Amino acid sequence: MVSRQEQFEQVQAVKKSINTASEEVKNQALLAMADHLVAATEEILAANALDMAAAKGKISDVMLDRLYLDADRIEAMARGIREVVALPDPIGEVLETSQLENGLVITKKRVAMGVIGIIYESRPNVTSDAAALTLKSGNAVVLRSGKDAYQTTHAIVTALKKGLETTTIHPNVIQLVEDTSRESSYAMMKAKGYLDLLIPRGGAGLINAVVENAIVPVIETGTGIVHVYVDKDADEDKALSIINNAKTSRPSVCNAMEVLLVHENKAASFLPRLEQVLVAERKEAGLEPIQFRLDSKASQFVSGQAAETQDFDTEFLDYVLAVKVVSSLEEAVAHIESHSTHHSDAIVTENAEAAAYFTDQVDSAAVYVNASTRFTDGGQFGLGCEMGISTQKLHARGPMGLKELTSYKYVVAGDGQIRE
């Protein structure tokens, strides 16, 4: 096993091969990575079978689905890499140019961060997404996967590095930390001088640990306590469709809905219809029904478990939905601001004034009007695959694409000027 220190030194030694690579060279490298990923399908699936067998019975079925790979999912990962090839290279972009009275010309240019560390949990597709985005944005990357997905991640990284071996980019610009202990995560948090940026992708425990302990710069990819508010002026059919999609299409992801707020004027008519769609119809179709966690008012209209206080502060990542009836738009917004993780929140309404109030007052990275929160995604936003969803305000916010993985520098051109 290569030590963490050796890996940090290896990536530092070769980072310039990607930091200063041309767009053509980077694109050739990405295409080779995608081709080798597909070519290694058999090996990746064998590794994934080991991870799945080890995880079965230890994690939920929803989490098992996040871990699971098949040939179609591997092809989708390769397609994601190829989509990054089609995106414009951000490196070298001139952001601003100005000329001072003394003749100095100051140009603000976009540059690579350098080396980016990613700590993430059991999601194999993050491996290929992270590698593609970091390399296209001119960065080397150090990956630290969750233990549950290590065999799969190792097979994916092996394929990606074999692709790089056919190009002029050194394969060591992608590093996978072999030690899956907690100590390896903390070592990355303390790797000042080796990592220029650290991005955690996972649950609240992981993200909080990184934010609280890291001495390297961090972009916080927050958990998603995502709300949908059904206003008194909502179109109920529209609301049913949006909620069904936001909650059931993929409940294990961070942009999935976790909390429903319903105006009291809508509760009696809307909640029974919602129960029919999310519970009865799903049972009839052989699908897992949604379990409701209901406040006292909501429980008057539908069946479910009484909500505990913590249910409105929980990212369930499962077929569970907390439901609260509110007396006004203002109460809905106040609840969201008290409980939201500032990821994605939505209002369903036909009232333009209510929509404007909601979008002005809700301080989240993505605020929706009459649309599913599942659109908070780099691909859906036209950014290609994403590095994560930032819930902080400094440097990056919302889906992080190529530009969010860069910095800038000032190039100052003169003709012998000196400061008086």
Curated annotation (Swiss-Prot):
Pathway noted in the entry: Amino-acid biosynthesis; L-proline biosynthesis; L-glutamate 5-semialdehyde from L-glutamate: step 2/2
Record keywords, A-Z: Amino-acid biosynthesis, Cytoplasm, NADP, Oxidoreductase, Proline biosynthesis
Keyword Cytoplasm: yes
GO molecular function: glutamate-5-semialdehyde dehydrogenase activity; NADP binding
Catalysed reaction equations from the record: L-glutamate 5-semialdehyde + phosphate + NADP(+) = L-glutamyl 5-phosphate + NADPH + H(+)
EC number: 1.2.1.41
Subcellular localization, as worded in the UniProt entry: Cytoplasm
One record GO biological process: L-proline biosynthetic process
Record-linked InterPro entries: Ald_DH/histidinol_DH (IPR016161), Ald_DH_C (IPR016163), Ald_DH_N (IPR016162), Aldehyde_DH_dom (IPR015590), G-glutamylP_reductase_CS (IPR020593), Glu-5-SA_DH (IPR012134), GPR_dom (IPR000965)
Uppermost EC category: oxidoreductase
NCBIfam families, sorted: PRK00197.1 (NF001221), proA (TIGR00407)
Family per similarity comment: Belongs to the gamma-glutamyl phosphate reductase family.
Name of the molecule in the record: Gamma-glutamyl phosphate reductase
Source organism per UniProt: Streptococcus pneumoniae serotype 4 (strain ATCC BAA-334 / TIGR4)
